[in-house]
């Protein structure tokens, strides 16, 4: 039986939700920023090409951020908390940035004697750039590779290579500035920061912070247009965004054939597993074993396909648990155990847009015949 066509946007939403988990963002952060970006495109009267690039940049900005996460965790500790705090500050403000890094190191070395803690913080700050710069550069490269695997064109991939660049040139990996930063990057960076700041600080403080960063992190003309229409742009974006909304916003709806779907599932599997060295290839191996078992049971080809694809994504909910937790020797704390037990729930939500291709198994990951 021929499988029903799958919209590429469904895969984009799955990737978006997964990256929200891994980066500590609030619920439907990428989806809400996509809606905001497309509303901004409306008030700016942007053409179809610009809308297409903004749409994809908003959903996929952080898809490469699982790469080498173990290196960030080894140096800074809980990488999800670190990323959550990063979105509330202006990274171009050196004092704010250093203060955040000091907090991260103090969390990591909590319980150490004062002299050891002080030395660990000094050493961590001194060695930080040797960790951060190559890892963050790698995020851009991995994002571009994933985008290529799911069939996205070169102009979208180019924008994903600039996810940490800023208008003022204080970004990474190349320190680009002004119009050298791709237009979708400039729009989506501001939109996503607006969502995060509004969530954390409230509407009025968010407006002040966005205005203050004009000419720094953001292009001044974009800030002016955003603040002129800010009430309209953010209306209703303090809650979840449903699948139908994102599908309706897709500028050029695109369906994927069986071969493209298979590669997209593989890309998701690899994205899940790249956080830690000992999980590389895990989901592929589980999928191979599960498909072989399904074939041995005499299941029809369509069911074997569904089992294989569900196995590709079975661990997607684990992205909500920090790598520093998985890699630390010793038993989990009560809070960490609760986080680990919740990962099937997060997996089911992440896979909701893909329907039976993964949702059911994602919600039962970790279950066994013995209960």
Label every model-predicted segment.
Residues 2-371:
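Histidine- and acidic-residue-rich, metal-dependent catalytic cores
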């Amino acid at each position: 039986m021929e499988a029903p066509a799958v919209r590429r946007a469904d895969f984009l939403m799955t990737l978006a939700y997964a990256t929200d988990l891994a980066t500590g963002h609030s619920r439907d952060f990428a989806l809400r920023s996509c809606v905001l970006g497309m509303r901004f495109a409306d008030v700016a009267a942007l053409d179809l090409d610009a809308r297409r690039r903004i749409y994809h940049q908003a959903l996929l900005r952080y898809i490469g951020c699982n790469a080498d996460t173990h290196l960030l965790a080894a140096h800074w500790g809980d990488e999800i908390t670190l990323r959550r705090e990063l979105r509330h500050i202006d990274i171009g403000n050196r004092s704010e940035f250093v203060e955040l890094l000091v907090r991260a190191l103090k969390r990591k070395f909590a319980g150490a004697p004062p002299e050891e803690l002080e030395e660990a913080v000094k050493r961590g700050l001194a060695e930080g750039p040797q960790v951060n710069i190559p890892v963050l550069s790698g995020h851009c490269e991995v994002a571009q590779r994933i985008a290529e695997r799911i069939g996205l064109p070169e102009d979208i991939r180019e924008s994903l290579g600039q996810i940490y660049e800023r208008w003022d040139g204080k970004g990474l990996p190349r320190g680009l500035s002004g119009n050298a930063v791709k237009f979708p990057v400039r729009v989506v960076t501001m939109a996503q920061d607006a969502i995060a700041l509004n969530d954390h600080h409230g509407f009025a403080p968010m407006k002040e912070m966005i205005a203050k960063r004009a000419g720094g992190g953001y292009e001044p003309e974009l800030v002016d247009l955003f603040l002129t229409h800010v009430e309209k742009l953010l209306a209703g974006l303090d809650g979840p965004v449903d699948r139908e909304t994102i599908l309706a916003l897709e500028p050029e709806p695109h369906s994927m054939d069986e071969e493209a779907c298979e590669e997209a599932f593989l890309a998701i599997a690899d994205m899940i597993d790249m956080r830690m060295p000992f999980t590389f290839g895990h989901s592929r191996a589980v999928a191979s074993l599960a498909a072989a078992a399904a074939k041995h049971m005499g299941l029809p080809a369509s069911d074997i396909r569904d089992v294989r694809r569900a196995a590709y994504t079975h661990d997607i909910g684990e992205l909500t648990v920090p790598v520093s937790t998985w890699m630390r020797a010793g038993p989990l704390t009560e809070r960490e155990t609760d986080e680990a037990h919740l990962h099937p729930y997060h997996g089911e939500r992440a896979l909701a847009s893909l329907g039976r291709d993964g949702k059911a198994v994602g919600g039962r990951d970790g279950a066994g015949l013995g209960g």
